[in-house]
Curated annotation (Swiss-Prot):
GO terms for cellular component: cytosol. The keyword Iron applies. PANTHER family: FE(2+)-TRAFFICKING PROTEIN-RELATED. Keywords: Iron. GO terms for molecular function: iron ion binding. It comes from the Bacteria. It comes from Thioalkalivibrio sulfidiphilus (strain HL-EbGR7). GO terms for biological process: cellular response to oxidative stress. This is Probable Fe(2+)-trafficking protein. HAMAP family: Fe_traffic_YggX. Could be a mediator in iron transactions between iron acquisition and iron-requiring processes, such as synthesis and/or repair of Fe-S clusters in biosynthetic enzymes. Belongs to the Fe(2+)-trafficking protein family.
């Protein structure tokens, strides 16, 4: 049976992650309160941030920025999109 969490992003009970997706306290907090569906929303948002800001994930400054945005995305009312961002049309 799948592990269920009360997802902080979706505001409902949903299937939880299989393991902490990030090291440290933030990873533990995400594991305990974020669903798989919400994590996928973050992955898409993170990809957009990396592309729009032309970040290199191995750069310590970029990693710190993404960590802060991840915390905001899940626990502080949401991460904002870059100024002037236009979502691709389908």
């Amino acid at each position: 049976m799948a592990r269920m969490v009360n997802c902080v992003l979706l505001g409902k009970e949903a299937e939880g992650l299989d393991f902490p997706p990030y090291p440290g306290e933030l990873g533990k907090k995400i594991y305990e309160g974020v669903s798989k569906e919400a994590w996928q929303k973050w992955v898409k948002h993170q990809t957009m941030l990396i592309n729009e800001y032309r970040l290199t994930p191995v750069d310590p400054k970029a990693r710190k920025f993404l960590e802060e945005e991840m915390d905001k995305f899940f626990f502080s009312g949401g991460s904002t999109k870059p100024e002037g961002y236009v979502a691709p049309s389908k």
